[in-house]
From Swiss-Prot:
It comes from Gallus gallus. Residues 214-217 are annotated as: Interaction with histone H3. Residues 261-553 are annotated as: Dehydrogenase domain. This is Cytokine-like nuclear factor N-PAC. Residues 168-180 bind DNA. Homotetramere. Binds to mononucleosomes. It is found in: Nucleus; Chromosome. NAD(+) binds at residues 271-285, 362, 505.
Amino acid sequence: MAAVSLRLGDLVWGKLGRYPPWPGKIVNPPKDLKKPRGKKCFFVKFFGTEDHAWIKVEQLKPYHLHKEEMIKINKGKRFQQAVDAVEEFLRKTKGKDQASSHNSSEEKNRRNSSEERGKQSAREEKRKASLSEGKLKKGTGEGKKRVSSVSSERGSKSPLKRAQDQSPRKRGRPPKDEKDLTIPESSTVKRVMTGTVAGFKWPPSVSEPVKDSDPHFHHFLLSQTEKPAVCYQAITKKLKVCEEETGSTSIQAADSTAVNGSITPTDKKIGFLGLGLMGSGIVSNLLKMGHTVTVWNRTAEKCDLFIQEGARLGRTPAEVVSTCDITFACVSDPKAAKDLVLGPSGVLQGIRPGKCYVDMSTVDADTVTELAQVIVSRGGRFLEAPVSGNQQLSNDGMLVILAAGDRGLYEDCSSCFQAMGKTSFFLGEVGNAAKMMLIVNMVQGSFMATIAEGLTLAQVTGQSQQTLLDILNQGQLASIFLDQKCQNILQGNFKPDFYLKYIQKDLRLAIALGDSVNHPTPMAAAANEVYKRAKALDQSDNDMSAVYRAYIH
């Protein structure tokens, strides 16, 4: 097949990493967004997903030539919305082109009419002048003098009048009341902003808005630029125009998880063990995105809701692993993770060569390394993938996934990670994800303790806690986490979104991690003591924000 030339403005199908092809348009990147070195690539704005990314030429295909092929292999709702947006955009653009052609024709007719009226006026003036000259020749001397005077006076005005009436028309200009309001596009602009691919000419505008665009998929891959802050400002400014034309309000990290609605679910059978706060939301999203899921939970009643949604029931962890291709597990702590694998009818009994096990629990590096060794010793494949987030983010499919271990298995889990999270990171060998997750939760737990300490200090010094929150929300610390946890405290609502006992467990494990490399963690140690006091006050099963009560009792 002959190579197809692509240019700025072309509509294309773009393939980004392991994600399915998606309709987009080649556009100009912001000035501060550097182009990747190496192979030729184009900056593509994807319809409907809010994505912008550099895509290599070999990963781009002309939209019209491959439309039927792509529609057959992609069936997601979000994908169909994107295709509809492209088609609507093309229909409207075609209508605008026809209207422009019609207006140009009318304008040409008006100009021709004006020129014709000018010529008729000139002929009439010439005829009148000829008649006047004939009368002068036949008149008396006095008459000649009088007529000559009048004729002279008329002759002094007529050329001026004729010049006024005719000169603009001779140049083909319309009268002032018929002024052409169309601003012609320069050939240079037209050449830059439009292009031809396989015989199709693409208009310079961008697509129309996609209805129900998901507001969650809105963050940008700043690692492509050496000046993240400057780049973010530049691209935000540049995309204000695109916002009006496409409904795009922000940009998504292009090398991470694609839009949930566009997922092509894997044909592999998925198992899931553990339906707690996090696991329940994860399974729900896997089912919504079309995955075949078998579930198991220590308390079987929790499985009922998911059975109604289309999941299958596994009687034991071993049965789930033996009947599924990839089995995920999300349990509370290291002991629960080990019991699930090594206990009676556990995961290990169902492992055979080729079976895959993904542990999403937040545990220490030693525990996850031990689990990996026993799984691999039976011929299985292992991946650790703890998640950063809370119950709400789990329900929304907006978790951050930290993975390490078998890279091939990480790729095989692509559609699952897309369903449950907004982005995923592969961190290398087993143990790295566990360490990173503990560090993340150490920072989060320490921050929560500091928030509670600040609110209680405001109270005892006679300051308004609400005013403190308002001030924090207007400053550099402003975040959804800060606002939600402060609201929990102000309203006295400690319904668990992230159990206090689990954040204290993570702090303890993070401190042990620091001890193992002789690294001091005094802030985490202090926060850990406050959480231990809160647990002593019977706050273990409340949200982590209940640490506030450790300061007021």
